[in-house]
């Protein structure tokens, strides 16, 4: 398994943010990680990437246990955080070259130019990051996650701030990457899940309430009626009343 989670638990004071969850994701699989705000999505992703230590349980990236060997695990991961920390005074190429050096990429210039082309950054590559629109800043974050050609992509809200045209381009990029990589991404845009994902994991109040191929989701959970949409299933599983 490219991503394997075994009994991960994280508490903040008296609040249990992630409650002993387990799941796995294989190579070539794109999995949507869904849940309302505060459900535990970002906390889980931070534990998977070694930025937060679990209180219990273990996470493995391509067989490497994250807590015991975080540096090796991170080299196998491309991570786009929800709060995408960038350096506003650096030029796009300069920043991506810096990330490539940190990731010990051997062909830095070639890798940077390839990823600029792949993520559609070429028209803005001559600018400093601080002068970019929110959508292009998001592309820079995605390019930084991809520049070292990782086996696993963990993307927290990767389409946030994109206009409809950019959204389609990034959607297609994620789908293309998912053919050879392992992709776990969170989003609040359920249409993105339907367009991109092979499978969906829904988390609510720190607990996994659904884990199923998208096409079989309605058959694997208890629902009040047949023919419910993904949005209706999501609302039902996360305790939201149906709209009138």
Predicted feature descriptions by range:
Residues 57-68, 72-73:
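Conserved ABC transporter NBD signature motif
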Residues 97, 101-124:
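Conserved ABC ATPase "signature" region
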Residues 147-151:
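A short, proline-enriched helix->beta-strand linker immediately N-terminal to the Walker B motif
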Residues 153-157:
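Catalytic Walker B motif of ABC-type/P-loop ATPase nucleotide-binding domains
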Residues 193-195:
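A short, surface-exposed alpha-helical micro-motif characterized by mixed small hydrophobic
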Residues 211-212:
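ABC ATPase "signature
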């Amino acid at each position: 398994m490219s991503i394997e989670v075994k009994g991960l638990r994280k508490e903040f004071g008296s609040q249990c943010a992630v409650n002993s969850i387990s799941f796995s994701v294989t190579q070539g699989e794109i999995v949507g990680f869904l849940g309302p705000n505060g459900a535990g999505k970002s906390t889980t992703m931070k534990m998977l990437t070694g930025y937060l230590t679990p209180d219990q349980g273990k996470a493995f990236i391509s067989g490497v246990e994250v807590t015991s060997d975080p540096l090796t695990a991170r080299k196998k991961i491309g991570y786009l955080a929800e709060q995408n920390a960038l350096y506003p005074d650096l030029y796009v190429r300069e920043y991506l070259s810096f990330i490539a050096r940190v990731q010990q990429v051997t062909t830095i210039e070639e890798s940077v130019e390839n990823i600029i082309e792949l993520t559609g950054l070429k028209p803005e590559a001559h600018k400093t990051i601080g002068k970019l629109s929110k959508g292009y800043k998001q592309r820079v974050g995605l390019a930084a996650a991809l520049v070292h050609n990782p086996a696993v992509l963990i993307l927290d809200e990767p389409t946030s701030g994109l206009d409809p045209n950019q959204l389609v381009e990034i959607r297609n990029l994620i789908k293309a990457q998912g053919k050879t990589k392992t992709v776990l991404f969170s989003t609040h845009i359920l249409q993105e899940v339907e367009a991109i994902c092979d499978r969906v994991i829904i988390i609510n109040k720190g607990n996994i309430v659904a884990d199923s191929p998208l096409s079989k989701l309605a058959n694997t959970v208890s629902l009040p009626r047949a023919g419910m949409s993904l949005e209706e299933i999501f609302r039902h599983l996360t305790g939201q009343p149906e709209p009138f």
